[in-house]
């Protein structure tokens, strides 16, 4: 595990160094929101000498009039709405560190994800999955498979309570195992600087026999407090139930997001397991970049 942490720390340090030199709010959706803010400020200069600065993270931007905070992944475990307005692209590198409770070596599941804004409240994500298995004698790194994901928001932001979004993911892992993962995504603002998200999840393999489907019913819930334009702190919770193995897993722990600029951001979420069926901990680290 020490080798894994040292490797991830070096990678994140390099990524941090490369992002500090870029400018603010480059996507077309964010530019639109900032342009409107500047116009409002100029038009009101003669009337107001000292005024409170608008809070950009909650500024409604883009074709769907969504708040700017939804244009990046605020919560590693919980998705909210669509992140990519029309004609925009995002990239994310994931490190999903799973530490078993029995003391065996950790497994680091990695994925490279590209998200595309298709318009009409649709988003398409493409993934490549790899895995690193730690072992003092023979650690290994290998290819796991591919998957794709489609999201559809039922309405523009704020038109329906919770901003419901339909999510479907199809996986092809180890070259032979197909899986599906439908979800319902919910999320919104709460209070002055609070945000929340809730996902209802079914994850299963495609198989004729129920025993081979390995179905898991789950939900994730997250709350975040936007401290400023760069920093968000919060907490996440996960529950998973496997209806074949009859196992339940409970997790809860802190999360944070730091935005380097309008392009890059870093998410860290650490959730210790709360019961014996759960892993000792699940830690997710994400580096994201908006083109």
Model-inferred region functions:
Residues 9-19:
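Bacterial N-terminal signal peptides
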Residues 25-291:
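Transmembrane beta-barrel domains of Gram-negative outer membranes and organellar outer membranes
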């Amino acid at each position: 595990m020490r080798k894994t942490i040292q490797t991830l720390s070096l990678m994140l340090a390099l990524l941090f160094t490369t992002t500090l030199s870029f400018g603010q709010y480059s996507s077309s959706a964010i530019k639109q929101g900032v342009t409107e803010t500047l116009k409002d400020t100029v038009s009101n200069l003669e009337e107001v000498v000292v005024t409170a600065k608008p809070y950009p993270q909650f500024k409604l931007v883009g074709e769907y009039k969504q708040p700017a905070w939804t244009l990046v992944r605020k919560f590693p475990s919980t998705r909210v709405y669509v992140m990519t307005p029309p004609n925009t692209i995002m990239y994310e590198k994931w490190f999903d560190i799973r530490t078993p409770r029995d003391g065996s070596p950790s497994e680091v599941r990695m994925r490279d994800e590209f998200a595309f804004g298709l318009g009409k409240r649709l988003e398409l994500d493409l993934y490549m999955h790899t895995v690193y298995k730690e072992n003092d004698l023979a650690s290994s790194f290998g290819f796991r498979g591919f998957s794709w994901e489609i999201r559809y928001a039922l309405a523009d932001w704020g038109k329906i309570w919770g901003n419901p979004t339909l999510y479907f993911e199809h996986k092809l892992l180890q070259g032979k195992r197909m899986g599906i993962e439908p979800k319902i995504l919910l999320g919104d603002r709460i209070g002055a600087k609070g945000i929340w998200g809730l996902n209802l999840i079914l994850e299963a393999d495609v198989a004729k026999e129920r025993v081979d489907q390995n179905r898991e019913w789950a939900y994730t819930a997250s709350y975040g407090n936007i401290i400023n334009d760069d920093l968000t702190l919060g907490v996440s919770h996960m529950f998973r139930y496997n209806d074949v193995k009859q196992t339940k897993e409970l997790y809860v722990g802190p999360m944070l997001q730091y935005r380097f600029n309008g392009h890059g951001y870093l998410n860290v979420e650490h959730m210790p397991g709360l019961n014996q069926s759960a892993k000792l901990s699940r830690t997710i680290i994400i580096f994201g970049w908006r083109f």
